[in-house]
Amino acid sequence: MSAYYRNNWSEEDPDYPDYSGSQNRTQGYLKTQGYPDVPGPLNNPDYPGTRSNPYSVASRTRPDYPGSLAEPNYPRSLSNPDYSGTRSNAYSAASRTSPDHPTSLPEPDYSEFQSHPYHRASSRQPDYPGSQRNPDFAGSSSSGNYAGSRTHPDHFGSLEPDYPGAQSNSDHPGPRANLNHPGSRKNLEHTSFRINPYADSLGKPDYPGADIQPNSPPFFGEPDYPSAEDNQNLPSTWREPDYSDAENGHDYGSSETPKMTRGVLSRTSSIQPSFRHRSDDPVGSLWGENDYPEGIEMASMEMANSYGHSLPGAPGSGYVNPAYVGESGPVHAYGNPPLSECDWHKSPQGQKLIASLIPMTSRDRIKAIRNQPRTMEEKRNLRKIVDKEKSKQTHRILQLNCCIQCLNSISRAYRRSKNSLSEILNSISLWQKTLKIIGGKFGTSVLSYFNFLRWLLKFNIFSFILNFSFIIIPQFTVAKKNTLQFTGLEFFTGVGYFRDTVMYYGFYTNSTIQHGNSGASYNMQLAYIFTIGACLTTCFFSLLFSMAKYFRNNFINPHIYSGGITKLIFCWDFTVTHEKAVKLKQKNLSTEIRENLSELRQENSKLTFNQLLTRFSAYMVAWVVSTGVAIACCAAVYYLAEYNLEFLKTHSNPGAVLLLPFVVSCINLAVPCIYSMFRLVERYEMPRHEVYVLLIRNIFLKISIIGILCYYWLNTVALSGEECWETLIGQDIYRLLLMDFVFSLVNSFLGEFLRRIIGMQLITSLGLQEFDIARNVLELIYAQTLVWIGIFFCPLLPFIQMIMLFIMFYSKNISLMMNFQPPSKAWRASQMMTFFIFLLFFPSFTGVLCTLAITIWRLKPSADCGPFRGLPLFIHSIYSWIDTLSTRPGYLWVVWIYRNLIGSVHFFFILTLIVLIITYLYWQITEGRKIMIRLLHEQIINEGKDKMFLIEKLIKLQDMEKKANPSSLVLERREVEQQGFLHLGEHDGSLDLRSRRSVQEGNPRA
C-alpha cells in the first residue's frame, strides 16, 4: 500500500516490479499447498524493488537513501529534535504545542475530541508517554529505538504498525494481542473474518501458521480461517466499515448500510481511532506527516477497481489511513464498491430511487426519470424496472377503480401518440440541414426569413388539403369536359383553358350532389362556404397560437435577456462526431457569440445630444419621404386600375391583362430598394431597429396597394355587370401572384448576380451586398395576403402558392450562398419571427377578413356561374340552411352559435381587440421581468464585489500574521513541499489561501 501513489504512474507497465498484473501470475501458486517462491517482486526478499530489502533503491527504510520516505533525521529535518521548526522541539517558535506560541491553534473543547488522542484533526499533538510524538516513548514512530520503527537498524522493511494498540507494541498490546479477542484469527470460536482495506498486502495472510495452511485460499478469494464458511453469505460483510462508530464517525459508506453486520464485524472497533476528513479542517490540510505509519498488516479483500488495487482510505475499510484521507483519486462517494453501469439499480441508492418512483403518477414519474443524470439506455431500463415493480404491487393491493384505470390508459395512450406524432413531424421536417447551414454562415437574422418561408409553406399545404378534399374532389364527380384549347399562354394570363376548370369560382356547380336515389346528398353551396370558412378560421387560430408561442419563447422567458452565456458555454454536443456536423456546429457557436457580443456593445453605447438631434432629423426626413412615395404609388395604382377596365374592353390582345400586374410588381420591387437606401442616411446603431423600420415602411406600402386593389375589385369589377365577376377577380389575383413570383426570380438570378459582378470586379469598394431581410419578408407577406383574398375566388391558389414557395426557397438559398455576404453587424433575430407573424396577422389577415366579410355579406353573386348563382347574397345560403335547422330541435345550438358569433360582423374585430389587449398585458409582464432580472444582476455583481473586498482584507491579515510569525510559515512551507513530493501530480483543493501564497512566495518558479 505504501507504494500505491508512488508507483501509480507505472501500474500499466507489465515489466514494472510493482505492476498489478504480476500479482495475477502468482495466483496459481497461492492456490496450492506449499507453493514455491517464484522469482519475482512479490516474495523475493532480494528483489531490488521489494520493501523488505534494506538495500533496495526504492526502500523506504534505507537509512542512507536521500529520497527515502522514512522519517529523515538529517540537519533541519522535521524529525530532528534540534530542528527549529520541528513539532517535538519544545523551544521551537512555531511549535504547536507551545502554550506561549501566539499562532497556536486553539484546541477543540468538545468531549469527543479529548477522548481520541490520535484524532488527526487535532491541532495540538498529545505529549503523554504513549504519544507517538513523544521521542522518548518506545512506541513512538519518531523514536529510533522502537522495534517496529522504520529507522530501526534491526528491523528493516517491517510493515508492523507502531501506533498504540498494534501487535508489535508491547506496551499497548491492543486487541490483536488478545488471543480470545473476537476478531482474532487465533480465536477459533469466532466466526468473523478480516477485511483487507488495501490491495498491496498481496494476499499474504499475517496470522501464525498461514504458510502451512493446507488449503490456501485463492488470491483475493474466500477466507481460509476456521468457521469462515459460516459467514460467507453475509450480505454486506466485505463492503461495510466494521468499527463501532462508523455511522457517527467518518463513514464514507452508503446511508442505507444494513444493520446486520454491526454486531459481527467488531475486530477493529476497539482499535480504530476517529478521524476527520482533511478537507474538513483547514489546518489539517497543511499537515504532511502521517500520524501512523503505513505498514499496517493487512489481509485480502474483494477488489473494486479496474486495476486490482484497493484505494488507500477507501470507504468500507477497517482502517483509514489519515495520510490518504481526502486525496484525489477514483474514490466513490459511497461505501460499496462501484457496480457496473447495467447493475447500478441494484445499489442501495438505485433501490431507493425505484422505491420513490413507484408511488408517483405516470406523468410525475416520467418527469423524474427524465431529470435523472443518466444515459438514455439507463433511463429506459429504470422505467422498465419501475413499471415491473409497480405491476407486481398492483397485483398485491386492491384493484383500482375502473374509471381511474380508464383515465390512466387514455392519458398513457395520449402521451404515446403525442410523442409518436412529434417524432414523425420531426422526421419529415423540411430543409433541416439547409437551415442549419444558413444559420451557421449568415446568422439568425437571415435564418428567420427562411424559417418564415417554411412556416408559410406548411400553412398552404394544409389549406390545399382542406380545399382539395371538400371542394375540388366533389366537383370532379360532376364536372363537364373542357372543350377549350390549351396554348401555354394560360400559365401567365390565367384565362382561356383555365377558365373552365376547378381553378376558378365560376366552374363549380350550385346543385346538390347525390349518387343514386338513396345515396347521401352533398350541398356544394354549404361545402364551398364552410370549407373556405374553416380554412380561414384554422389560419386565424394558427396565427394566434404561433404568435403566442413565439412571443412567450422570445419575449417573456427570462433566459432571452441573460445574454445566452450559459448556452454558449455548455451547449457543445459531444455526440456529434461527423466532421461536417462539427464544423457546422462551430460556425453556429461563433455566430451566436458574435451576435451576443454585438448586442452587449450596442447596449452600452451612448450618444451625445448633438448626435441624437442629427439622427432624429434624419429619421424625420426619411419617414416623410417614404410616406410620400407610398402615397404616390397608391394613387398611381388606383388610377391605373380604373383605366385598366376600359383598356381591356378596347384591346383584345391576351397580353393586355398583364399591364396592371406588371406595374404593381415594378412598384413592389423598386420602392423597397429605395427604402433600403435610407439606411445610409439614418445609420441605426442596432440592425434590429433598421429592419423594424424597413418592415413598417414596406408593409404600409404593400398593404396600401392591396387595399386599393380590393376597393377596385369590390366596387368596380363586382358592379360592372360582367358575366362572372368572381372569376375575373380570381384571374387578377392569379396574375398578380404569378408576376410577383417572376419578378422575385428575375431579381434573385439576374439582379443580385449583376450586383455581385459589379461589387467584385467593377467597383470593388462596394463589395458583396447583404441580404435584405425586410424586403424579402414583405414579399412573402404580400403574396400570402393575395392568397387569402383569392382563396374564395380561386380555390387552387394555396396549391399554386405552395409550388412557388418551394421554388423560391431553393432560388433564394442559391442566390444567398453565391451573391451575399454575412451581415457586417451580427445581431440576434430571435424575436423577428414573432414580429413577422404579427405583421401577417395584423394588418394582413385582418384586412383579408374584412374584404371577405364585405364580399359575403354585401355583394350579390353572379347569376350565371358559381355555386351561389341565383342568390341575392352569398350569405343567403347560410340563412336558408339555418332556417332549415331551426325547425329541428336537435340543432338549435348550431343556430345560436351562428346568430351570436358567426353572424356578427364585429365578432372578429372584438376578438382581434382582445388578442391585442392580452398581448399588451404580456408585454407589460415582460417589462417587469426585465427590470427584475436587471436588479438581480446588479445584486450578483455587488455580492461579488463584497467577496473580493473580504478576500483582500483576509490577505492583508494573513500578510500581517506572516510578518509577525515567519517561523511558522517556514514549517508550513516545508510540510506543503513534502506533501507535494509524496503526492506529485495530484491536486489538493483543500489548501487554504495562506499555504498557497507561502508556496508561491517560497518558490517563484511555481
UniProtKB/Swiss-Prot annotation:
UniProt keyword list: Membrane, Transmembrane, Transmembrane helix
Primary location: membrane
Transmembrane residue ranges: 459-479, 486-508, 526-546, 620-640, 655-675, 699-719, 733-753, 787-807, 836-856, 901-921
Superkingdom of origin organism: Eukaryota
InterPro entries (alphabetical): TMC, TMC_dom
Annotated membrane topology: Multi-pass membrane protein
Record topology, Cytoplasmic segments: 480-485, 547-619, 676-698, 754-786, 857-900
Protein's job: Probable component of an ion channel. Molecular function hasn't been characterized yet.
Protein name: Transmembrane channel-like protein 5
Taxonomic source organism: Homo sapiens
Taxonomy of the source species: Eukaryota, Metazoa, Chordata, Craniata, Vertebrata
Gene it is expressed from: TMC5
